[in-house]
Curated annotation (Swiss-Prot):
Source organism: Cyanothece sp. (strain PCC 7425 / ATCC 29141)
Keyword annotations: Nucleotide-binding
GO cellular component: cytosol
Family: Belongs to the YajQ family.
GO molecular function: nucleotide binding
Entry annotated with the keyword Nucleotide-binding: yes
The keyword Nucleotide-binding is annotated on this UniProt entry: yes
A Pfam family hit: DUF520
General function of this protein: Nucleotide-binding protein.
The name this protein goes by in its record: Nucleotide-binding protein Cyan7425_1379
Length: 163
């Protein structure tokens, strides 16, 4: 019996949970006394989240609210890639937060290299924005998952298609 088992290492997030986190952030901004009159906007688009507010202090408070709401919805904070704070018209500040999705080739190569050096019986292969890991033993795959979880990656990793 020469069956091989595999799983995919991906970096993804639940879009609906992100929509809910942004919606809850907007509701809290409207209800909090210190943020009510700041005319803050939090806009969600496919490429990222744009926060427009009156000061950097308020921007920090809104980032904290967004992070709290995202964490409560089981979203990793590593999906947020904070851009620089820009001054816009009328003494206002704006920040674009890009959303990280998918494993880029550089991080994919690092994951592959780590697996190849630590586990001789396991074969990693980069497939687009995911890394497929295959082996003849399910136990080897479980060890790979545990090892990858121990590392501090700059992106959020999920393990899918475990077969």
């Amino acid at each position: 019996m020469a069956a091989t088992y595999s799983f995919d290492v991906v970096s993804d997030f639940d879009w609906q949970e992100l929509v809910n986190a942004v919606d809850q952030t907007e509701r809290e901004i409207k209800s909090r006394y210190d943020l009510k009159d700041t005319k803050t906007t939090v806009e969600l688009a496919k490429e990222g989240i744009t926060i427009n507010t009156d000061s950097e202090f308020t921007l920090d408070a809104i980032q904290t609210i967004l992070q709290t709401k995202a964490a409560k919805r089981n979203l990793s904070l590593k999906i947020f890639d904070y851009g620089k704070v820009e001054s816009v018209s009328g003494n206002r500040v704006q920040q674009v937060i890009k959303l990280r999705k998918g494993i880029d080739s550089e991080i994919g190569k690092e994951i592959s290299k780590l697996i190849r050096t630590d586990f001789k019986k396991v074969q990693p292969s980069i497939q687009g924005d995911a890394v497929r890991v295959s082996a003849k033993s399910k136990d080897d795959l479980q060890e790979v998952i545990q090892r990858l979880k121990q590392e501090d990656w700059p992106i959020a990793l999920q393990f899918t298609n475990y077969r």
